[in-house]
Amino acid sequence: MSDDWKIRFGTAGTSDSFAAQGYKTSLEVPEYTAKMGLNAFEYQCGRGVRLGLDKAAKMAAFSAPKDILFSVHAPYYISMSSLEEDKRLNSIQYLLQSAAVCRALGGKRIIFHSGSCGKQSRE
């Protein structure tokens, strides 16, 4: 089966067990994920993209031998349908930042919520 279609299982972020098992930094995420027998990890940027590209590249290097594939969850405050132009433009930047981190992680997927239509009509 092609790696593009390989079924993967992983977590979305780390749980309390990450620290309880003695892990301290995101560079240890690949080891933590592999130890659980998983082969995917969704890096959470729900409150902002705070992972540097250099660190993301190191995480990718550590995950490759373990066959762990990353995805990225973009910030929750994205609102592509906001009536305010600055919010829409900022949302585009958040998506681009998420894409850059995903690429550095060697990931292929970005998860995001586009926002509701708010006060606009759906028509």
Predicted regions and their residues:
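Active-site acidic/histidine proton-transfer and metal-coordination neighborhood
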Residues: 81-123
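N-terminal pre-domain/capping segments
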Residues: 1-97
